Amino acid sequence: MQRSTRLYLVPTPIGNLEDITLRALIVLKEVDTILAEDTRTSSKLIKHHKINNKLESFHAFNEHKRLDSLIQRLKQGEIMALISDAGTPAISDPGFLLVRACHEQSIPVECLPGATALIPALVNSGLPSDRFVFEGFLPPKKGRKSRLEKIKEESRTVILYESPHRLLKTLKQLGELLGNDRQVSISRELTKLHEETINGSFEELLDYYQNNTLKGELVIVIAGK
């Protein structure tokens, strides 16, 4: 690891605590400060791998407020790592603003390769993976309809993140818009004990999830038009 000012973006496991690279562990042990989306969640990983560095919160509700002070600390020589609760930071998680500010101030940014939920879900879906588009989380209300309309016309495989309490609503809306026979794959609890991937049509998956209890974050992979 380079001992010069920079921001490291460090992917963390999406479930199994062993799914972290040796390089990521070295970086987390050697930086001055670790910025975490939720320090309570990240402390489990930190303790598991015997990392003793300072942990500070950096999340959607304080990133604007903390941005200037973090940039000043980086400019003064501090070395930081940004992690999310699970997976690669700044993908459907806080981090974009800090990365952009670092580039604007000529502060080096280095992103390590590592875990992210969308790629295992895509590969495991059996749907075309040579061309795909990642939409993240759909808006819960405002802008949801227009986003769904864009997905309707998409010829590439589409990947979405969704929470359990909104899944049935999302499947119903997508089925009505794209056709209930459109093929879809849903992965949940990736890398965990109860990992599950279900493939079928929107109609089949809606029926399945109406009769099965849901837990854990979900990845929806939809066949293109």
What are these regions (language model features)?
Residues 57-64, 137-139:
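Conserved helicase motor
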Residues 28-34, 106-109, 157-158:
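Short active-site oxyanion
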Residues 6-10, 76-84, 132, 156-160, ...:
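Generic beta-sheet signal
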Residues 59, 67-116:
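Glycine/small-residue-rich loop that forms an oxyanion/phosphate-binding "nest" at active or ligand-binding sites
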Residues 1-60:
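Glycine-rich, flexible N-terminal cofactor/catalytic loop recognition
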Residues 97-154:
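Class I SAM-dependent methyltransferase SAM-binding "motif I" and its flanking Rossmann-like core
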Residues 78-79, 157, 161-225:
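A contiguous loop/helix-start segment that scaffolds small-molecule binding in enzyme catalytic cores
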